[in-house]
Amino acid sequence: MNPRSPFSIAILLTLPVVLLSACWQRGSRTPAEAKARLAAAVAARDPSRLWNALDLDTQWSWMTALRAGREAYDITLSNLPEGQLRERMIRRFQPAATSENAAELFAKSLAVDLWPSLAGQIAAASDRAPTQNAAGSEAEIVWPAGRLLFRKASQSAFGWGFAGLAAEAEALKRTASADLEALRTNAADYERAAARGSR
């Protein structure tokens, strides 16, 4: 067996470090780092950086909404007859259908007043560090008028993220999923009606 070259040994020694760094690209190592990441995104008013600052559950909700919206758009085009309802549904699902990924859909959907709202929360939190709960799954900074909430993903590789937009994302996911189920039912009804009409 040929002995390993110094070059190959160096690669093997550095590979775990590279893999570890890649794992931490989603989420932050600590709640304090997650807060800093959020603050930087808000200061820059950068939707992409804000997306990367979110906790994993919030991102998953947007990913689910994206998938549901795309399928709903396809069903609308394929099955709904011409008319006002079809046009309304096309407009409703078009943002998801034309988004390359969930981050882009998130960016399209940001309310204008979100940036000043988040900036105000970060200013109110000042330089205080987030306090973790006993389970180590959440951390928060609380003041009389509000709080900043951070969550750690159950998958250790994904780290901490800002969870202050989680409730809105969950509501969006539920609505998108309900819309999709309703459209699936309607599409089946249209198909049965068309089949009867062709007899």
Question: Where are the regions that the model predicts?
Answer:
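Bacterial N-terminal signal peptides that target proteins for export
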Residues: 2-11
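Hydrophobic membrane-insertion alpha-helices, especially the h-region
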Residues: 14-18
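C-terminal motif of bacterial Sec signal peptides marking the signal peptidase cleavage site
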Residues: 20-22
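Bacterial signal peptide processing site
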Residues: 24-26
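Amphipathic alpha-helical repeat elements characteristic of tetratricopeptide repeat
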Residues: 28-32, 44, 177, 184
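Short solvent-exposed beta->alpha transition segments
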Residues: 32, 47, 52-132
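Short helix-adjacent coil turns
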Residues: 37-50
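Short beta-strand edge/turn micro-motifs at domain boundaries
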Residues: 104, 113-123, 129, 136-192
